[in-house]
UniProtKB/Swiss-Prot annotation:
Protein name: Probable G-protein coupled receptor 160
Physiological role: Orphan receptor.
Places the protein is found: Cell membrane
Extracellular side stretches: 1-23, 80-93, 158-177, 266-268
Residues carrying covalently attached carbohydrate according to the record: N8
Example of a GO MF term: G protein-coupled receptor activity
Keyword Nucleotide-binding: no
Ranges facing Cytoplasmic side: 45-58, 115-136, 199-244, 290-338
Record-level GO cellular component terms: plasma membrane; receptor complex
Species of the source: Homo sapiens (Human)
TM spans (from-to): 24-44, 59-79, 94-114, 137-157, 178-198, 245-265, 269-289
Membrane topology label: Multi-pass membrane protein
Amino acid sequence: MTALSSENCSFQYQLRQTNQPLDVNYLLFLIILGKILLNILTLGMRRKNTCQNFMEYFCISLAFVDLLLLVNISIILYFRDFVLLSIRFTKYHICLFTQIISFTYGFLHYPVFLTACIDYCLNFSKTTKLSFKCQKLFYFFTVILIWISVLAYVLGDPAIYQSLKAQNAYSRHCPFYVSIQSYWLSFFMVMILFVAFITCWEEVTTLVQAIRITSYMNETILYFPFSSHSSYTVRSKKIFLSKLIVCFLSTWLPFVLLQVIIVLLKVQIPAYIEMNIPWLYFVNSFLIATVYWFNCHKLNLKDIGLPLDPFVNWKCCFIPLTIPNLEQIEKPISIMIC
């Protein structure tokens, strides 16, 4: 009886060990599916006609790669064991593909951040004058080049290759890469926001108390009740910075608090989850605000061509709007997207 009981326990342990990767695979499927739904929701909430910048093209490419990963996982989960182009695919390839994607996503933060920053600087200075079609092709091939370069680096790095090779097909665990780039990028942005807020916290407090949320031209805006400038150049950099902070936090405050928690607690999030479209749009708004700040002396309000933000309406946040009969405009509403 004892021997039989031991054999049963051994069999149950082996069965549990065999089914473990399958449970992880279904969990990965649900996570990627949830991420894709978040991508669709975020892309649907953005302002339209804002596709003429690098970050927009990269966000669309990221959504496509996530969808491609979900399709691969679904096919492998459905067929479980099949041969394609003389290559045998099993459910253990789900972990392998997701690990490769995690490494790729993890190394994309710095290149995307720097490329988007250069793109906004060039567009703001108007040093590049490309036609609409040429600009679309340029962004398209730039995004493709970044993806291919990072993927080639991941597949060609010996340390990454050994890490992937060490995870054999029957491993009970499927560890994923946690990007150090995203942590330091979050730390960098949170510290800059903190220093900027401390520098002009009095102006920010005054603006928040005097600000009005109203509807203008079928759009909900922030209205700053200040007198119009005698010239068409923004002079007070401190007041301008406070308006940028108010506009930024009016949209991204929950995300800023989330980044503070991640930085302080050093939360380890797998790279295939951490690289997402809401995060990219958050970085995008931060970059636009930074470009405005460093070029505030060039902001000509008569002939202004501001980068379009899918979520933050920067123009109505710092340009002195002359709105006649403000009292007759619709009453302020509680839900607002700046």
